[in-house]
């Protein structure tokens, strides 16, 4: 077999996944030449081969490079084989930072610095930080920062400055006053502002709530007291309560018989003769006649007050309990009927929009008085005028008492 067959026979591959045997063609050619030179003398071949191969092995130094135990600098990855390179590059190695010297701050005397600030808020849920927590946390932060900044060491060298400041939680800031000097100095600047804000906010809130309650109570009390005082003096003067004419659903005006009875008892006796005059004149009035259609107010119904609310005299029960459908007129009145109820109804009729206005001229009043004096009570309009006239004099403090006797027959 020739050289070509033997060379191709050396390149034998059994399995693509492994067990492959490859021989370089240069080594095979050199082995064939040496075999032709020395023949079958294997001893001479081995010795000659070793003598010739010694200088070539010295030119290829072999060295096992192990990874560093802990990378503490950018230049620790480089391994220098020649002594000249090691001496030349040894000057470029920077200072190595030991963790024993590191407590809170690490600073190197260089211009370009990168500062990292970590602020923790009550990480152990107790409001206090011990020295063990600080030291373990500081070492952990330094290791993490050192490992994360290694990839940028080839571009430009920088010094790392790690600063850790521990600040208590705002809730613990008020209840715990035993901190370090740094925390105490920090609290001396922050605490007055926060306490003043909380104090002013609490003061505003309490003042607002207290002011609302006092305003509601004070307004209610003032309104009730002023209304009662005003009603009392109006009743003493013989004038109807102005608010009771329009607000019929008011509990102060409708559903307070004791107060009205007490007011009625305190009235002067000068009004009693007038009450008898009203009763005598009401006995002479005729029953209600069908009124003129022009004086009717379409959908308006006149409500009479309830017997409970309108009774000013204790023991006197009025007979009128239904609404009067005659505009300006009343049902027959008995001797024991409430006179103020009658005057208030007539005053309510006087304010209807279709009837005559409350403020008549003196000419119309005098004409109505002359008509009433000459003829009996026949015209319903005259009756309405007389009643309105009487009610008007009742509101004007009874300046015209002599007219009341003038109408009697």
UniProtKB/Swiss-Prot annotation:
UniProtKB keywords: Calcium, Cell membrane, Cytoplasm, Lipoprotein, Membrane, Metal-binding, Myristate, Wnt signaling pathway
Main localisation: membrane
Listed GO MF terms: calcium ion binding
Region described as Disordered: 160-224, 243-315, 346-366, 388-409
Compositional bias annotation for Basic and acidic residues: 171-185, 193-224
Lipidation (N-myristoyl glycine): 2
Entry GO terms, CC: cytoplasm; plasma membrane
GO biological process terms on file: Kupffer's vesicle development; negative regulation of canonical Wnt signaling pathway; negative regulation of Wnt signaling pathway; Spemann organizer formation; Wnt signaling pathway
Subcellular compartments: Cell membrane; Cytoplasm
Composition bias, Basic residues: 389-409
Domain of life assignment: Eukaryota
Binding site for Ca(2+): 122, 124, 126, 128, 133
Keyword Cytoplasm assigned: yes
EF-hand domain mapped to chain residues: 109-144
Segments of skewed composition (Low complexity): 247-268
Tissue-by-tissue expression: Expressed ubiquitously until 1 dpf, when expression becomes confined to the anterior CNS, with slight expression in the developing tail.
Family: Belongs to the NKD family.
Function: Cell autonomous antagonist of both the canonical and non-canonical Wnt signaling pathways.
PANTHER family: PROTEIN NAKED CUTICLE, PROTEIN NAKED CUTICLE HOMOLOG 2
Protein name per Swiss-Prot or TrEMBL: Protein naked cuticle homolog 2
Species annotation: Danio rerio
